[in-house]
Amino acid sequence: RDDSTKPLASFVVTEYSVSNQKNRPVMFSFNGGPGSASLWLHMGVLGPKVVKVPSDASDDGSPPYNLINNKLSPLDKADLVFIDPIGTGYSRPLGEHEGKEFWGVKQDAVVIAEFIRRWINDNKRWNSPRYILGESYGGIRGPLLVSELRSGVLTNIEVNGLLLVSPAADMQYIRFAPGNNSPHYGYLPTYAVTAYYHGKVDTDLTLLEFYENSKKFSLEKYGPALLKGTRISQEEYDEIVKEYSFYTGLSEEFVRNSDLRVEASDFRKELLRDEGFSVGRADSRYKMKDYVAAGQYPDTDASMEGFSSAYVSALHTWFSEIGVETVMLYQSSDRDLYNNWDWNSTQDQKW
């Protein structure tokens, strides 16, 4: 609600509580994106029930799906609250308000912090140890949430712990842009193990040995070479092309044409182009046939085709089993949210 108590948006969360203890730890969890709902952590890692998908990336993503008890759920140690940001899950803006009002680095942190404050107050959990767990973009949202929660003059809320899962703590290292070399040497070891998995490298090394060597090459030779820009010698350039090709399974011609800088989408398309496949983004072990092998970008994310439906279906199945009934559709992700995200809203942030 705003200062006049008019409703702005509706947060619909999933919470699990195993006792009435008012000082039992509680953990607030969310996935990243921005634009992702929390079902991935909920049904894949933390919840009392999780969906079991094959670990060898061979599944085609078709039902039925196997919903199993999660012996590793932290529910025996803490109550769990899975947060779906506005525009994801069942959380929606209300009345005349639009999702864009909540879609930004600062806006997102403010509204989720306000939800956490209200949840603590409504559930009388002011004396409970509080933990925040964020995945991917949660590496940015999490620290901002801690700051927002601590900033309240009358409702200052301290957090006992912040847990980050594969965090995107620095967007510079994952966003490809002209002049930004960071993601190129940061991604290379992932390219290397992907090429190794798909049989595109000629080596007798084990996967771990190959991975460690690729990291060494990336940090000690490839990264410094990129920083030299046009000052790099032809001899060094040719050597980098050769080694880059060896580690990634891409042709030397393609590496040259990319000027040593291959973006992730290009790699996913090029690695298995000769076979007519592209590899997955979320999990590069998955591969899927492309309709047009000559295109620049993959037709789809093969990995999401492999397991996305399993998570969505498992969540609805679980909700049905525990008596949750709604005519709303659960929004697992929202591309419109990501495309309209305000990345500049923290420029005036005071730390």
Task: Enumerate the predicted regions with their spans.
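Asp/Glu-centered strand-loop micro-motifs enriched in Gly/Pro and often flanked by an aromatic residue
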Residues: 1-20, 121, 343-351
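N-terminal cap/lid subdomain of alpha/beta-hydrolase-fold enzymes
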Residues: 7-101
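A catalytic-pocket lid/entrance helix-loop region that shapes and gates access to the active site
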Residues: 47-53, 58, 146, 150-249
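Residue in the alpha/beta-hydrolase core beta-strand immediately N-terminal to the catalytic nucleophile
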Residues: 84, 131, 161-163
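Alpha/beta-hydrolase fold nucleophile elbow
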Residues: 124-137
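Glycine-rich nucleophile elbow surrounding the catalytic serine of serine-hydrolase chemistry
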Residues: 134-147
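Alpha/beta-hydrolase fold catalytic core
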Residues: 228-351
